[in-house]
Amino acid sequence: MKFFLMCLIIFPIMGVLGKKNGYPLDRNGKTTECSGVNAIAPHYCNSECTKVYYAESGYCCWGACYCFGLEDDKPIGPMKDITKKYCDVQIIPS
């Protein structure tokens, strides 16, 4: 019984850290665009996602950098479900 009560107290305090995918937002609430030359260079968004937003990887999807493995506390831009499903399939290997 004591073990059960202790678990009820400790687990919520520990929290659950997860990863998410999406278009990360900067301080101004804008996404990193990858149009033109940046869209052609496949490593631009991967570099932005890993070095600026501390994600696992990223690539250009629909004109903005789409990051994989963002921390839960990083804000991401709103998107439609169909866009998320499309961008979640990583086309360009990082």
Swiss-Prot record:
Swiss-Prot/TrEMBL domain comment: Has the structural arrangement of an alpha-helix connected to antiparallel beta-sheets by disulfide bonds (CS-alpha/beta).
Signal peptide: 1-18
Protein localization: Secreted
Domain of life: Eukaryota
PROSITE patterns: LCN_CSAB
Keywords carried by this UniProt record: Disulfide bond, Ion channel impairing toxin, Neurotoxin, Secreted, Signal, Toxin, Voltage-gated sodium channel impairing toxin
Annotated phenotype, changing D88A: Small effect on toxicity and on the binding affinity to cockroach neuronal membranes
InterPro entries reported in the protein's UniProt record: LCN-type_CS_alpha_beta_dom, Scorpion_toxin-like_sf, Scorpion_toxinL/defensin
Protein name, per record: Beta-insect excitatory toxin Bj-xtrIT
Function of the protein: Excitatory insect toxins induce a spastic paralysis. They bind voltage-independently at site-4 of sodium channels (Nav) and shift the voltage of activation toward more negative potentials thereby affecting sodium channel activation and promoting spontaneous and repetitive firing. This toxin is active only on insects.
Disulfide bond is among the record's keywords: yes
Effect of substituting K19A: Small effect on toxicity and binding affinity to cockroach neuronal membranes
CDD domains assigned: neurotoxins_LC_scorpion
Listed Gene3D superfamilies: Knottin, scorpion toxin-like
GO molecular function: sodium channel inhibitor activity; toxin activity
Ranges for domain LCN-type CS-alpha/beta: 20-88
Family under the similarity heading: Belongs to the long (4 C-C) scorpion toxin superfamily. Sodium channel inhibitor family. Beta subfamily.
